[in-house]
Amino acid sequence: MIDIEVLHRVAATLAERKKADPDSSYVSSLYAKGTDAICKKVAEEAAETIMAAKDKDMLHVVWEVTDLWFHSLVLLTHFGLSVDDVLAEFRRREGVSGIDEKKSRTVS
C-alpha cells in the first residue's frame, strides 16, 4: 500500500521552498530558474529512469522513479497544482480502457 501522505508531506515542503532563498535551497533555485529548468530536470530524470530500466537495474529504477516523481511534484507545485489533482485524474481513469480514455480526450 502506498503511503500517499508522504507525497503530501513532500508537496508541502516543496510549497514552502517557493518562498525560500534560491541560494539556500536546491528546489528554490529550480523555481527561480523557471519552467524550462524544471522541465529539463523532469526530462533528465525520465531519461535516467529509462536507462535504468533498459539496464534491468531494479534498484536504480526505484531511485530514478523517486527522482522523477520528486521533480514532477516540483513541476506541479510550480504551476499551483497538487498531488490531489493527479490522484483525482487517476480516479477518473480507473477502470477505463486506455484506448477509450485516449479517445475521450479533447483535442486543443
Swiss-Prot record:
Its main location: cytoplasm. Its EC number is 3.6.1.31. It catalyses: 1-(5-phospho-beta-D-ribosyl)-ATP + H2O = 1-(5-phospho-beta-D-ribosyl)-5'-AMP + diphosphate + H(+). CDD domains: NTP-PPase_HisIE_like. It holds the Pfam family PRA-PH. One of its GO terms (biological process) is L-histidine biosynthetic process. GO terms for molecular function: ATP binding; phosphoribosyl-ATP diphosphatase activity. It comes from the Bacteria. The keyword Transit peptide does not apply. Signal peptide: none annotated. Belongs to the PRA-PH family. This is Phosphoribosyl-ATP pyrophosphatase. It comes from Aromatoleum aromaticum (strain DSM 19018 / LMG 30748 / EbN1). The gene is hisE.
